[in-house]
A protein has these predicted regions:
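Alpha-helical transmembrane segments and adjacent TM-loop junctions that form the membrane-embedded core
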Residues: 4-10, 33, 47-306
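The first (N-terminal) embedded transmembrane alpha-helix
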Residues: 10-22
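Active-site cores that bind ATP or allylic diphosphates and position pyrophosphate for catalysis
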Residues: 40
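Alpha-helical transmembrane segments and their membrane-interface boundaries
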Residues: 43-44
Length: 306
């Protein structure tokens, strides 16, 4: 099991526990925001399970090149990563939008009462757990560099922020009991839910945007510039006429195709010499490993490069 998968498994385990606690405490306290918090965690945990499966597939594709699985998907599994990331981010945004609509409806209907003691206990537990898991995932990802873990850490930060705001609201509601401000109690839960859901809706947007760009194979400008600079140096060094480069980033994978236009009637080279040039270009591009798909071709016919 890779380090990435280990971190995701622990995140899933803790998230499912928090989700169960959230739904239970939400029912006992009568808090819609706590129930939403639990359902939100459950949604996140379910998507993290899918994320873990995809991470395993990508790892298996990089190691077992001749397995039955890679025979059916011999171009790799990179394309699954942006799909899962986009789906995950979209579902988290959708859950927050639904919570916002629910909170507005509750406000318009006069709010509702709840047991602040149970709600405060739940919120305190989740805030502590969320901060611990966010820090754990962030520290682990320093050496891993996984987009999956980036999104998982964002989810923990979102959960901690949401529940932290709930904790403040619940403590305020508990403190005003028996005072002249007690009339505000029924509105605390829906107002807290409305504020939190509004704040977290845009957080997964950048992840969804990047996932969509990967799915559509939008050319990354930085990668394209890097490849073009290297290819231009090779054109000048070996006397080629020009080159054509095609690049894309799909999840953690980089797909690079370079076609060099060679002069017609040039001096013949042994195949070993062409391979040496390929190796030289590959070393300059960098990132050699299972997450780089590099194709380098030489031709005298421009039509093959277009």
């Amino acid at each position: 099991m890779s380090r990435e998968q280990e971190v995701l498994r622990r995140s899933i385990f803790v998230t499912f526990i928090i989700a169960g606690i959230g739904v239970g405490f939400g029912v006992v306290s009568g808090s819609s925001s706590v129930i939403f918090d639990g359902i939100y965690s459950l949604t996140d945990a379910s998507m993290t399970v899918l994320t873990l499966l995809v991470a395993r597939l990508i790892a298996a594709g990089g190691v077992g090149r001749h397995s039955k699985l890679t025979e059916r998907f011999n171009m790799g599994f990179w394309h699954l990563e942006p799909i899962v990331l986009g789906l995950n981010g979209s579902m988290l945004m959708g859950a927050a939008i639904y919570a916002l609509i629910t909170s507005i409806g509750s406000l318009l209907s006069g709010g509702h009462d709840l047991e602040f003691g149970w709600a405060i206990l739940y919120a305190a537990i989740v805030v502590v757990a969320g901060c611990i898991m966010a820090n754990y995932g962030h520290r682990a990802n320093r050496s891993i560099g996984s987009n999956f873990l980036v999104l998982d850490v964002k989810a923990w930060i979102m959960a901690s922020a949401m529940t932290g705001a709930l904790l403040v609201a619940f403590i305020f509601g508990w403190l005003i009991q028996g005072t002249g401000l007690e009339w505000m109690s029924p509105y605390i839960d829906p107002v807290a839910l409305m504020v939190i859901s509004t704040a977290v809706i845009p957080i997964p947007f950048s992840t969804v945007k990047q996932a969509l760009a990967d799915i559509l194979l939008v050319t990354p400008p930085d990668l394209r510039q890097h490849v073009d600079e290297i290819a231009l140096r090779q054109v000048e060094k070996y006397g080629f006429l020009s080159h054509r480069a095609y690049v894309a980033r799909v999840g953690r994978g980089r797909q690079i195709e370079i076609y060099f236009i060679v002069p017609t009637g040039g001096a013949p080279r042994r195949l070993e010499e062409w391979d040496r040039i390929r190796d030289e270009i590959g070393e300059e591009i960098g990132g050699e490993g299972p997450d780089r798909w590099l194709t380098i071709a030489f031709t005298t016919d421009r039509a093959w490069a277009e």
